[in-house]
Amino acid sequence: MLLFTAVISVPMLLLAVSVLMSVIYDSMFKPMNHGMPFHRSFAYPAMIVVFLISLLLLAFLFSKSIHSLLHKINLLNQTIRHLASDQRVPDKIEVKRADEIGELIKSVNLLIERTTYRELELRQQEEIKKELLQKLRHDINTPLTALRLQLFYLEDQCHGQAVFESLYQQIEYISELTNEFNLYSAETLESSYIVNEEVRLNELLETAVKKWDYLYSMSGIELHYKPADQDVIWMSNTLWMERLFDNIFQNTLRHSKAKKMEVTIEHGDVFIRDDGIGFDRNESSEGLGLKIIEDTCRLLAITYELHTNDNGTGFLFSKE
């Protein structure tokens, strides 16, 4: 619309100035100049001067309009960029004129309102989820405390310290998992918050083997552990690595039908092998366990290799 007005205004201005000057000359100055034609009189150059002055004034007005239009476009551009960034939601823009730019500003304001609503809704959902996780953590820890007390009294009456030690370790592990509820989301591993720390592989795997040794012996599986000659330290997260290896121990116990499992630390890498029947990666139960292993390794920046066939399954874990 602005471009059309600018194009049509120049000839219209020339026509208006020429007609006005001609009328003024004919009515006031032509009798004084003895009927001299307009184009030969002094009024003609005066008309040119008036036209040029009017043209400059018109150009100034259009430049102001274009500057105002560019200012609105830049304001819209900055607002949309702020809306797309991780910063706070921008304030709505004031609509000053009911033109095309005004309609566009109304649309952007509607988008800002929608984004603000969604942000508040997500924040409220996040608070509700945190509250539910805290309640769940409390509800889990309450029976765990009672279970510890009951085991304490049973320990004096029964023999078999290995059984009680394994149960205590499992209870402590569940308790540590509940303490992590405030560090990561319950929905995806990608949204988890990981604190890297020094993890001593010899100690971690020795603890894991002791924890699972009783259950493996009850299932007729020999569990052998060969630590490294020297301490091997990875920058990772102890609890998440426990979850990683516990998942492997659990899957082997449930599905492998193995007679022997070996856990070895060699050249800074972790090797876990069994002599079971292997598994099909596309099968739902094993596939879910493998997905957990893949996601956890990606989360901890651990490289792993998997080999499985009818003669058993082998895992290789390494970290740069």
From Swiss-Prot:
Cytoplasmic topological intervals: 63-320
Domain Histidine kinase residues, every copy: 135-320
Annotated TM spans: 1-21, 42-62
Topology Extracellular: residue spans: 22-41
Domain HAMP: 67-120
Reaction(s) the record says it catalyses: ATP + protein L-histidine = ADP + protein N-phospho-L-histidine
CC annotations in GO: plasma membrane
Free-text function comment from the UniProt entry: Member of the two-component regulatory system YbdK/YbdJ. Probably activates YbdJ by phosphorylation.
Protein name as annotated: Sensor histidine kinase YbdK
Organism: Bacillus subtilis (strain 168)
